Amino acid sequence: MKKFRMIHHADRATIAAMYEHYAPVFILSTGRAGSKFIVELLNLDARVLACHEPRPTLEYFCDWASRHQEQGDVLGRMIDAARMEMVLEACIQERIFIESNQCLTFFAPALAALFKSAKFVHLVRHPGDFVVSAARKGWHRNDSIWEAGRARLADERRWSAMDQVERLAWLWDFTNRYLRDFLAALPAARRLTCRLEDLLGGERAVMELFTFCGADMPEAGKVTAIQGRPVNTLWVDADEPDNMKKNPAFPAFKDWPAGEREKVARACAATARELDYEL
């Protein structure tokens, strides 16, 4: 592959080689699972170009993508238009493009078909902790572009009968089962599952992640510094509009009454067991 300083100098052969041989890494999740933390961690290697939610974010199209998996050509065109130039830029700079945008989750098959050597990380978090974090952010209560596009049950009657906890528990299970099945169809060299708790808790999972991405493991002290501080904490603006329903006081999962915890267990128990989580 020729070397170019600028993207607008890239020739057709370079573009074709990028699609076929370059290996961007897409970190897919439910959201509220450490996707911003993982970007800060990976950017410790200067060769990495890791992004959390670059624009276009595609937040309005998550639910549509989840319901139209059979329209692979349409999904592929959408993701090509949204990401081709970013990936090509990183490619000609000889950097490792990594994106941890939750909104790409249901575009995963399109990404795999478009970028033939792309790698995928399934990032997971305990279902109870996910529900708490998402509820505090107002997920499935806000009236916003994000909520308009968030994945939901196709059965509107059943969906309208569910409360916020039930909806978020359903979302955790639906998304993680989808990603589990997607990764299972990939060669082992192109897939990795990471639990947020393991990435926060020591060096082994972090080293496995860096190795998988083709990045160099940074100094232990730098890793520990990021592991030890909050990333992407909830912020409620003083002039927050009333269509936003954030709730910073939503209680931690361990403090829930048994009946509320059972809602999460009913929706998530089988998938949680597969991922070594206890409910």
Regions found by a protein language model. Give the residues of each.
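Short His-Asn-centered micro-motif
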Residues: 28-30, 98-102, 124-125, 196
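PAPS-dependent sulfotransferase catalytic core
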Residues: 1-91, 139-141, 243
